[in-house]
Amino acid sequence: MTAKAQVKLYTRPGCHLCEEAKREILAANCSQDYVLEEINVETDPALVEHYGWEIPVIIINGIKAFKYRVTAAEFRSKLKRLSRS
């Protein structure tokens, strides 16, 4: 059995692009292949310093995969590519 990919979605409250990104991730219909962790950058000053307003950011298995916008098809494709061992 292959381990699930680790997906981190860096967001902040009131961010409409963040909401869109999460919708697209969920619309990709491949949730069986990953574990999603949504992280509010405002909870950690270091994250605010690092990301500022440049969110959403999607990290797959430790690799920055997307910034700002993503489609369900793009997410599925990159998840598959970055999940290969």
Name each region found by the language model.
Residues 2-27:
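Local sequence-structure signature of Cys/Sec-based thiol-disulfide redox active-site neighborhoods
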Residues 63-85:
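Non-catalytic, surface beta->alpha helical segment in thiol-disulfide oxidoreductase systems
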